[in-house]
Amino acid sequence: DGSRAAAGDHMIALGSSGPHSNGYSLIRKVMEKSKPSSNQLDSLIEPTKIYVKSILSLINELPVNAISHITGGGLLENLPRVLPSHLAAKIDPTSWELPEIFQWLQAEGNIDITEMYRVLNCGVGMVVVVPEAKSQLTIDHLNICGEKAWLIGEVVKSNGKQILI
C-alpha cells in the first residue's frame, strides 16, 4: 500500500517489453499517419512482461516499501498512487534512454514528453521503492532475476506535486 515509503527512499525501475497493452488509442493515431517498420510492429505486439517471479523473489530477500505497476496513466499517474500524499516521486529522465519504439512514437506523433509520460510506460514497466541503503542490492537482485533494473529516482517530501520530472 506504500505506507512504508519515506523521503530518501530510492525508486528502482524495471524495464518494459514495449507498450504493455497501454496507450493504443494514441499508438493507432500515430500509425494512421506513419507506417511502422516490421521491427517496430514487433515491438508494438510484444507480449506484456510479467514481473511476478522477480518481484516475489525480491520481496522475500529485501525490504520493499512500495510497488507501482506502470500501466495506463504512465509514470505520471501510477507513481503517485503508491505514495502517501505528503511524499512525491522525483524521477531522473536522464537515467534511461527511451526505447526505440517510444522514440519513434514521439517523433512520428509529435507527442510532447509530458504526454508520453502520462500515456505510455516509456520503457518502465514497474517501479519498486526501497530504502536507499538497499538500492544497489535491489538492482543487483533484479538483474540476477533477468530484469533490466536501474535507479530512476527517489522519494522526496511533496511541495504540492506528487511527481517531479
Each model region followed by its residue ranges:
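Phosphate/diphosphate-binding glycine-rich loops and adjacent basic-rich segments that engage nucleotide
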Residues: 1-35, 162-163
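Glycine-/charge-enriched secondary-structure boundary and capping motifs
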Residues: 33-165
